[in-house]
Amino acid sequence: MSSPFQQILTTTSATNAIAASSAVPVECLHARGANSLASNAHTVLPGLDSQASPQSGQKEEMRRKNAEAQMQNDSNHSETTLFQSDLDTALQSLGYGSQTNQAYQNHPSRSREDITNSRAERHSQTSTQPKNVHAVSEPMATTSLDCGVLPLPSSALDEEFLNLDFPNQERIYIDLEPQHSNSTSSSSDEKCHCLSHIIQSLNRNRQGNHIRRDSMNKIHLLNEAAEQFLMCDSNHSKLWYIILLALYQDADDSLSSAEEPQERMGAHSGAKGFCGNIKSNLDTMVCHASLAWILNG
């Protein structure tokens, strides 16, 4: 039977043997684990790199595209600014605005600050221009008569103004004859009576029947007054020739339009011949009055 000391030695040696036998697998395990981890790391890292490289490439591509778009926007903005500057310069040299420029000013692509600044600049340029400046192509035609540019009437018209509603014939004669006429004198015996004869003839014809006046009698009176008037040596006013022509024209119109009764005209054939003679005398006296007016003018 072995002693206790021998049993202890046997147990110790057995333990050492077990430990020695178990140390080799542990070391081998550690070596194999380290090698496998390294190999696995080398295997995994390329896979991660291959997975990360497309994502980084996409990000880089997006970053590059964004930079190009920003550069393009900057270039477009600079070109727009240059175009607007050239357009404003051209419009200022021409001196007028255009609808194209107005549409461009209000385009939504332009910023609100640029639109406000351009409007303020146009307002200042418009306010500095004078009010009375007109375009060269503006028509100057007018459709109404401007009375401000008409000359003033002559004072001779006021002196020769006619007013037949006077109480007596002498006042009519004095006021109808112009003051600068040579026919007016201090002595009433030396005054010309041809004008008063015309007034008397007209007054006698006016005192007749106002409803139906005798046109032929009026023409006879005008013939007598005109003959005396044309033979007068006084320097009468030109207005009297106009009065005579107007009186003859009025008598001619009355003679042409009036229908006289047959008993007042006499026989029908005789009336036609008599009216023809009156019209002939009328035309002759009108010619004489016109000629005298021209010669004395």
Swiss-Prot record:
The keyword Transcription regulation applies. Residues 69-80 have a biased composition (Polar residues). It is found in: Nucleus. Residues 58-67, 110-124 have a biased composition (Basic and acidic residues). It comes from the Eukaryota. Disulfide bonds: none annotated. The keyword Transcription regulation applies. GO terms for cellular component: nucleus. Keywords: Nucleus, Transcription, Transcription regulation, Virulence. Residues 45-80, 100-134 are annotated as: Disordered. Probable transcription factor; part of the gene cluster that mediates the biosynthesis of the secondary metabolite victorin, the molecular basis for Victoria blight of oats. May play a role in the regulation of the production of victorin. This is Probable transcription factor vicR. It comes from Bipolaris victoriae (strain FI3) (Victoria blight of oats agent).
